């Protein structure tokens, strides 16, 4: 069953298709806000907001399902096209700020463009291989799961390693988290009203991935708040001196 098309959807799903499409649109809006905010933060703070591996993985996945296996859903395809465009801009911004961010590692700082290009190619090839192995429809969903987990867990690690809110904000976190939650809602509708094709979405590995994503992103929000409070307290103490 093609995971992109609704042409063979049962009547039960057709009744809620408007809601599914709305969730896809809101997912796109959330992520586009996130990408736009990342670009702004990158140029204001001279740093990048998304880790190297998650960024390469996202671009590789988006390229596959924009160019190699494009969705027949126009809303979804438009979201992919806009996402990959903004991600490339984010990559340029990250390359621009690499010398500042990687002062402790000249090998990375001086070869960031090559690292990004190589990383994106490897991830792109991996997603193409996954589509060839299990089919584009399933690979699309599992590729998205991989991207989300790498991004969520990587984001927590990056925040804890930096121990600063530089390069991040509540807007960045919420737009990403809520955008991904809309994707979860879309998947729920397909599982609930189209079980013939999407019963696998209630499988153990999918549910583990969902729980891990939610736990990681909530952890990110809590850590962001705690670090922000520490920075605020430090600023107040500095002003009193």
From Swiss-Prot:
Does the keyword Transmembrane helix belong to this entry? yes
Keyword Repeat present in the record's keywords: the answer is no
Q: In which compartments does the protein localize?
A: Membrane
* Topology term for the membrane: Multi-pass membrane protein
Instruction: Give the record's keywords alphabetically.
Output: Glycoprotein, Lyase, Membrane, Transmembrane, Transmembrane helix
- List, alphabetically, the InterPro entries matched: PaxB-like
> In the record, what terms sit under GO molecular function?
lyase activity
Q: What is its EC number?
A: 4.2.3.-
List, alphabetically, the GO terms of the cellular component aspect. membrane
User: What stretches pass through the bilayer?
Assistant: 19-39, 48-68, 75-95, 114-134, 137-157, 169-189, 198-218
**Glycan-bearing residues:** 163
What Pfam families does its record include? Pyr4-TMTC (PF25129)
Primary location: membrane
Q: In which family does this protein belong, per the annotation?
A: Belongs to the paxB family.
* Role description: Terpene cyclase; part of the gene cluster that mediates the biosynthesis of terpendoles, indole-diterpene (IDT) mycotoxins including terpendole I, terpendole K, terpendole C, as well as the kinesin Eg5 inhibitor terpendole E. Terpendoles biosynthesis begins with the synthesis of geranylgeranyl diphosphate (GGPP) by a yet unidentified GGPP synthase.
* Protein's name according to its UniProt entry: Terpene cyclase terB
